[in-house]
């Protein structure tokens, strides 16, 4: 219990720091996959020092979602535990690739001992990674990391296994009576639609979740309607069949902006689906805008009976889950993503061998959202 209270206090303290200045320096800033327990301060080995603490910039994809504030909290806790100095920053939104590149360049000019990076575009930071490799500055990816890096600078990544995490939502749909009965009774004359709403088809984390959900949902659907499951909506996932009884419709918004996601959500809702999975907080935000902040999902509402699962957290999503408007959601452990990113960076800076870390995922719904361990993961 003491550790839980300590973690909660750390989260609250760093949220306050992030709110004041997004780029300020801080001295301390299917089956559910179990979240990794954060090591206590007395369990962390001391960082190698030569009179000054290690300096490690932690460059995020943005502050657009509260997810990143929880990541910042974890990175600050690790900085305190390992006695290192970090600088956590990111662009205002996840569309500002040039802004992130400039931030990373500025930090590289300070010759840090290591760097943690969640790149908006691997291509855009390739030259920076090459310089890191030349200077022997190890890079640790976090969240979606730096997919496809060919420079050798990226030594490991702290992230959720997104495919496994999203598959949890598909498995939960298979436990829902409404969805199961619809799949059992589906016909080619009256096919059942199950939707997947994603804000893009580029980000490694979002595409991984889309793939994980679609593949697992298709596998499940095949057990009810063999040979009659069609995946449609986007070329990256499309596997059409003739006369389908179940259609898994992949809806990708034109941009990551909330209004664009809302438009994609409205199109999906117009197909009269039995269930929809929203693959990140951005998808959830756009979807909720399309259903009157969730009220259209309530009893007597326009979309009452629609089974919806989300991903990540945020105040609006938590409210939808708590109200019973959402069937439930999958949460990553953003605190652990930040913590493990800094932990790996410290180890790499000290010459230790490092490897990828799966930071875990959990399902939460109205029945467990207030449980102590879930409450640590579902940020506002």
Question: Where are the regions a protein language model picked out?
Answer:
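A general lysine-centric signal
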Residues: 2-3, 61
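Sec-dependent N-terminal signal peptides of Gram-positive bacterial secreted proteins and lipoproteins
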Residues: 4-23
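A residue-level marker of the well-folded mature domains of exported/periplasmic proteins
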Residues: 20-380
